[in-house]
From Swiss-Prot:
Belongs to the PsbE/PsbF family. The keyword Ligase does not apply. The gene is psbE. It is found in: Plastid, Chloroplast thylakoid membrane. It comes from the Eukaryota. InterPro entries: PSII_cyt_b559_asu, PSII_cyt_b559_asu_sf, PSII_cyt_b559_CS, PSII_cyt_b559_N, PSII_cytb559_asu_lum. It comes from Staurastrum punctulatum (Green alga). It holds the Pfam family Cytochrom_B559a. This is Cytochrome b559 subunit alpha. Heme binds at H23.
Amino acid sequence: MSGNTGERPFGDIITSIRYWVIHSITIPSLFIAGWLFVSTGLAYDVFGSPRPNEYFTESRQEVPLITGRFNSLDQLDEFTRSL
């Protein structure tokens, strides 16, 4: 037989008014904050990923594939120089 840990049962937690008052504010706030983080472009700046219009430049329209096994660093340097 399992012992009592003294924790509140989950059923009591999700049926309490206090739980829903707190979570009815925090869950939509997190959703809105995430939407703003992505829609303003801040996510691109924070993680350093290129924006959708920056994947291909005017000078380079091909996909930057690494094709050589032994000269991959040279190919990477060439791709980054063209940016």
